[in-house]
């Protein structure tokens, strides 16, 4: 189904104009003299005077851009800007008063519905936070990505460009003290409070981005298309929405078919992938649809201009210009659906639930032609006041997705329970809204402001503060000595420390070494972590921990989380010494331990790695990209640069830290020592590489004798094959770079160990 809001004709016309007219830098005569290779088809011209990426010419070329985006130089505040300090200096009450005043001050250029912008801002907030997905932690409110393409031009975000412009005077007033990402969420909270709802809390602390995130939003090349399910109907990993350009599901039904039960299946999958259970899902949909209305006064194709990304420069970043009627107010067009769900669209009530469950509904179409539902009882058709025209009334409406909550048995049970107990319903929506808008912020230590709830919720991955280490430098040295005297090898210590810390995801700041959850379910049982080896290492480290903490001479305590990291630190220093180098790996104590009761097994299971190229692990059944692409994806989640990724792979191979001790890529005769052999031997021209009979495995032979020397995976060989990675690998293969390699590895290792702090 093509969505009328994404103006394909306008976009095609824009591109055609560029193709035909060229740029200001190429004359018609110059273009007429252009030639193309013999046998080539088409014009041979894409966009004149535009550089093309390597992926344009070679689509299978490894793309390293994710490891170079969000450069610090993009931030106009500069590297020394302290957002936490700026936010904490803010008088939040004054900001909220200003937002409240804005809500009921209608602007002529975009008048408010029902004389209140609250419902509009709630939609803006929801759609900012609602892109979050659990499988890779990407999306969410953090960064204020709704300001940038593609999100600012998604069909589901139609008209939200105006919502952000309405907020601009407040942003301009408070400047850098409140980020766009925080302001967008705060505006939604204040809107709820303005309309009589008691929210659960609000936390600041979201940093703004200054460029679009590189996120895989789906395989489709047209907005509103849906080609992301396998033959069994399962949604492709790691996606959460069912259509390109939608936040969740098609409100008219699966692929536009008005099937409430089919819609319920889509809703359940989409919200599960956003970390919401059935109760939270029901509360969010019902609570959100208590407010405001949908807009489909006319057919979009007859009235709307291009989305912001395709609109003319004179529109100044706004899109969807409406040429019909007033162009706003009662002529507003967004989704194409039209009408309000309740009789009081600017008040917190249970009317959505009572309407949904009590009324019988019949299918109809909006003025824009979208499928929707109205009550069969015609006496209800004048129950809802018009948003702009005094004295005019309408029927309440529901979408197919709304009716899913009535016809799905499990959702209906929850809806009936909430209707019978308004306070349970209110609290469920309050907590679900708080989770929705804060899910991508990581642990509660990242939360700022006086409205942060005192309670630490399980989805925030809490840690027992009482277990935090307080060991000093002498204690660190004593513990390192005890670890190295144990029966644990360098490789075992490195593997478990890496497994603990590398569970971190920069996208939603979850995982990491803090909490020592590698000793708990489900992380201790993940295949990538080699459960038997992990159990052995944890058992030994716990014994060392108990001896140290129970010692009469010990004035300090050490957590298991710190001891796991310290084990890796000690192992690396020993491995460097065994290779003839001296390096001091920084270690900062203070981590604490979590308990099993503090760990949401279902939510934490979604962090399980299906691929970790740093350990040469790849699950072909569960991974959604090639091994080398998954390596880059993981490096991106660890916030690594290209050199950091490179030196870590080379060092971990030298340390024999592969999954289950596999020898692929261990290009050294001294495994377990820290040296640059991986790079030296990978770039050695006396070795010729060939595919083996085992899929994904390569064999390296001596070019003269034919003797097999090594085995490797594509993750190993890409550092010699890819021109950019080879350039970095060459640096670490220099005879003069041996000490540099060790120091750079130690620095990158330390960075990973501390990502969650």
Swiss-Prot record:
Residues of the site described as Transition state stabilizer: 123
Catalytic activity: H2O2 + AH2 = A + 2 H2O; 2 H2O2 = O2 + 2 H2O
Active site: 127 (proton acceptor)
A single GO BP: cellular response to hydrogen peroxide
A Pfam family per the record: peroxidase
Cofactor mode of binding and number, as noted: Binds 1 heme b (iron(II)-protoporphyrin IX) group per dimer.
HAMAP family found in the cross-reference section: Catal_peroxid (MF_01961)
Quaternary structure, from the entry: Homodimer or homotetramer.
Name of the protein in its database record: Catalase-peroxidase 2
Organism: Shewanella frigidimarina (strain NCIMB 400)
Upper classification of the organism: Bacteria, Pseudomonadati, Pseudomonadota, Gammaproteobacteria, Alteromonadales
